[in-house]
Amino acid sequence: MNVELRIHGVAGASPGSVLYPGSDKPGKLLEDGVSGGVGFYRPDPQPTPGWIRQAYVWGGLTSGSKTRALWLLLLPFALVNIAFFMTPHRIVDGRERRKPLRKTVDSLQRLFALSLTATALFGFTGVYLNILAWQSAHTPFGGPLSWLSTLNANDISLRLSLSSLIPALALSLMWLLSTRTWKHTDQIPAPQGPPPSPGPLLNRRRMWNGGPPVGRLRSLHVAFGFTLIATTLTLADPHPWLLTAEAIIGATIVLTVALPQAATRKDPEAERERLLTTFCTTLRWAGLLVYGAALLVPLSGPGEQATPGPLPGFDPMVESVFWTQIALMVVVAIGVAILARGQEDASGDNRYGRALLGLAAPATMLIAWTYTAALAIGAAFIVAEMVGTPAFSRVDVPEAIVLPESFAWALYAVPIAVVMLIALALWLWLTYRRTARKINDLISSHYPRPEHERVSKAWAAAALTDRAQAVFATIALTAIGTLVLVGVIRTTQLTIKPWPPLVLAGAIILIVFVIALMVVGYAAYRLPSLRRTVGVLWDISTFWPRATHPFAPPCYSERVVPELITRVNHLIADGNTVVLSGHSQGSVIAAAVVLQLDPAARPSTRLLTHGSPLRRLYARYFPTYFDTTTLREVQNATPWNNLYRNSDPIGGPVATDIDQAVWDPVSPPPDSPIRGHIDYYVDDDYRTALNSLTTP
């Protein structure tokens, strides 16, 4: 018997829309191993004689729960995690070259991810400790802890201790959420298979066996976060023994994160590194203990009087992390450039070259850092404006709230970025118009003249996806330009000060950005349709395991891929031929499953992809995992057909000998719908391609 196992794509999908596409009267649905809306479904009765149709529905893992809307705050962590998988490996004749350099780049990326945790916490400590607890004590507003002023004149220690509970609570919440998702995704064991071969990285089951390494990284990030909050408290009222303990714990955490063993994934049957896991857990409790000491020790002393200006030690801490992050990004960029050099597509097919010349990883890291800094700086400006008057240097104004001067220079990038994005939008519009004119000439023999404009516009809009790297480059270049400007000014000690109008414009735009993000998050929490739209971010980003940042949204593939492998093996054991039918992101999942199957199971497996981004996006941005060698390995593993439309903004061709272009819209009749990325199932070409895979 032939089994068609459908795997849907981005933006979620209901079981009915996958099993009964385009039907006004769908039949009954039977669940099979469904948990939380995720699992296998089949229609009753089966709609096609001689075929068993099933669907694997996984959209609930990224857009099902209302709490997924809060993942917008975790986007920087997801981006820095994606950057890890964008990093190229130099593979020559099936063997990796320059492995020490690649491992060094991996370690630096983990350290950068750790620094992002620091930046996120600076957003909380900057607001609650620096502004509300310390500086607002001098303002007429007094802050939300103004009632403490009725106790005594030296209440600053109590103000700081109480305020530190909010950052600690935020960190504890990230700890709790990452632990819960870790148990439901990373801890699901990958099925044991044959010994790993020196082939594509995707055929190694260790990739989906992330329980131990993600657990270790989580412990280290939690430890670092609590140590950072403790240090912020201690610098306001220094105790040498406490500062020494914090420095030792912090340095130990940094060194441990840099160790390759901290994040090493092993095959399912391999022995776990229990000693290192125990050490990381010990560091986590040490970080929590030192925070408890920093919280309570100042309360036992005579108390300190808050001095005008920022919280002692806070600005230097922010600045040191700021420049450390820049150094990490520069070194990673150099390392990635060396790894990417000379790694062009060996097949000679240059339709889709490597994105950003192979430098997508550092560009994505830069965007993640920009996003995190924007949230932290925007929140600081909003609160500073509420309780006083924001300033960047000490001024003789009672209500002045002094923010780090680096914030002012960072704000320079905001209006400049807006101007550059407007210019980019204009360029994309001109490109769209020019492409539409070219397409109009190409389709003249296939469509009647009244259809030309509609079809050419749809195809031209879809082609803009191939310009996506221009957006990455614009944001990255803006940030780089600003950093160079600030670096020159700071290192040469020029007396140039930030230009107030540009700083004001940046502050306003940044405040609007933060408020807009909150509005979108709230709306996504309330509206399932918007939540599915926002969920597209997670459909793409959380396909990848949490290799560098444990607080990133969970990797659904660590549940999806093992479940699909188990189902395919079960169906094949019953004597069936299984056609994995992957649409959009489902095609990426299906390709990963094919490579994970035991060689003995592959002859009974077929692959049908439609609207697939495998070559158009994944091979460009993740060449280590989806280059032509890997895609050729999938072809060698099982018969494969790929359908694509020129009107599809996501899917595209994969390989010449398996591709089949589908006209969209179909003609005649006129005015038939342009389907773009959806409803491949209802095309006649789909049924033809499906049957051809099982016809001798």
Spans of model-derived segments:
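N-terminal membrane-targeting/anchoring modules of bacterial envelope and secretion proteins
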Residues: 1-508, 512-542, 546-553, 568
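Lipolytic serine-hydrolase domain surface
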Residues: 527-562, 604-606, 612-696
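Conserved acidic catalytic loop of the alpha/beta-hydrolase fold
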Residues: 563-576
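Short helix-terminating capping/connector loops at secondary-structure junctions
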Residues: 574-575, 600-603
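Gly/Ala-rich beta-loop-alpha elbow adjacent to hydrolase catalytic centers
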Residues: 581-591
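Active-site signature of alpha/beta-hydrolase-fold catalytic machinery across serine-
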Residues: 592-596
